[in-house]
Amino acid sequence: MLYYRNLALLSLLSLSSAAPSQVERSPDAVFKPRAVCTPTAGGSSSIDDVPAIRKAISSCGNGGTIVFPAGSTYYLNSVLDLAGCSNCDIQVEGLLMFSGSTEYWGGKTAMININKINALKLRSLTGSGVIDGNGQNAYDLFASNSDYERPTLLYITGGSNIEVSGLRQRNPPNVFNSVKGDAKDVTFTNLRMDATSRSDNPPKNTDGFDIGSSTHVTISSVSVSNDDDCVALKPGCNYVTVENVTCTGSHGISVGSLGKSSADTVQNVYAHRITMIDSTKAAGIKTYPSGNGHGLSTVKNVTFSDFNVRGCDYAFQIQSCYGESASYCASHPGNAILQDIIVKGFSGTTSGKDDWVVADLNCGARGTCDVSMSDFSVKAPSGKATVLCANTPSSLGVTCTSGASG
């Protein structure tokens, strides 16, 4: 019996040793809270708060949280570089007000620079946070000097896992948001964006989003009021989703322009549930023709779906002679490759600027025009609808009238 009792005891010990043992960890290692920093505002537009913000990033940028409280105003008189902010959470609940100095900002690339940063959140949890580019002086100067170089409000180059959400962006001197440099997994959501001039000089070139060389960019639940492209899909962008977006006064959701001086590609774009108000077009593709140093443009797998058109000049437009005259393109036809382009679910009414014309599809005579249209019910104010076409396939899906241009 003693033998069997010892054997049972050994079996229990063996089972106990085989089971995973609990590892002791210090509470700090498991539940260590994020460091939280609140920059000290100078309280005057004559005091640049960027150094104080940089100090907060130095202290809390690595895995911490930086808070700009509701009701606070921070004056930014120089470029805000977010370098050092890795896996950090920047919460803007107050106002970030940039200076209107055309002297300082002339020639600058960015007002907020996000360069090769991974895991960054720039957001407002309450929806009260505002980033103001204070662009009025730039609008006025650019009206008299088109060579004046203006900065982008938020400039993302490279990096990954970047979220911009819940904010109001207003009055950038130039583009609101730019993404390039092979950035990956960038999300813009729940943004209110408006560029408004207080003078007769419009806020020129205030694209809502310029999406360049990047992969997996999402733009959702955004409203944009501006004076240029709502979303510009630039060379090198791949896998872009644009959804639940309302644009007013813009140039629409635009692929391009492509092929100005090099071979350019845009591919895998899905834009759906878009409301386009008082814009030059709801959606379109812009490519340069052949010759004169222009490169080959390739646009693949792009879907424009469920667009509500309200007072736009065109619902859909293809320009294969962008940047050149009609006489030039007669001898140097467009050669862009448009492959698997789907336009479906468009409804609403155009502005009537071009009488009954609701779409203008000028595909290149030497290119590929793999475009299909379905459930397209946009009409002119008169109730009639004409789609102008050139070099489009017989399988297009709508009745064409010759005479397309652009």
From Swiss-Prot:
Cellular localisation: Secreted
Residues carrying sugar: N244, N301
This enzyme's EC code(s): 3.2.1.-
Organism encoding this protein: Neosartorya fischeri (strain ATCC 1020 / DSM 3700 / CBS 544.65 / FGSC A1164 / JCM 1740 / NRRL 181 / WB 181) (Aspergillus fischerianus)
Family of this protein: Belongs to the glycosyl hydrolase 28 family.
Function: Pectinolytic enzyme involved in the degradation of xylogalacturonan (xga), a galacturonan backbone heavily substituted with xylose, and which is one important component of the hairy regions of pectin. Activity requires a galacturonic acid backbone substituted with xylose.
Each PbH1 repeat, start to end: 183-213, 214-235, 237-257, 299-320
GO function terms (MF aspect): polygalacturonase activity
A cellular component term, taken from the record's GO annotations: extracellular region
UniProt name for this protein: Probable endo-xylogalacturonan hydrolase A
Residues spanning the signal sequence: 1-18
A Pfam family matched in the record: Glyco_hydro_28
UniProt record, GO biological process: cell wall organization; pectin catabolic process
InterPro entries according to UniProt: Glyco_hydro_28, PbH1, Pectin_lyas_fold, Pectin_lyase_fold/virulence
Swiss-Prot/TrEMBL keywords: Carbohydrate metabolism, Cell wall biogenesis/degradation, Glycoprotein, Glycosidase, Hydrolase, Polysaccharide degradation, Repeat, Secreted, Signal
Entry keyword Hydrolase: yes
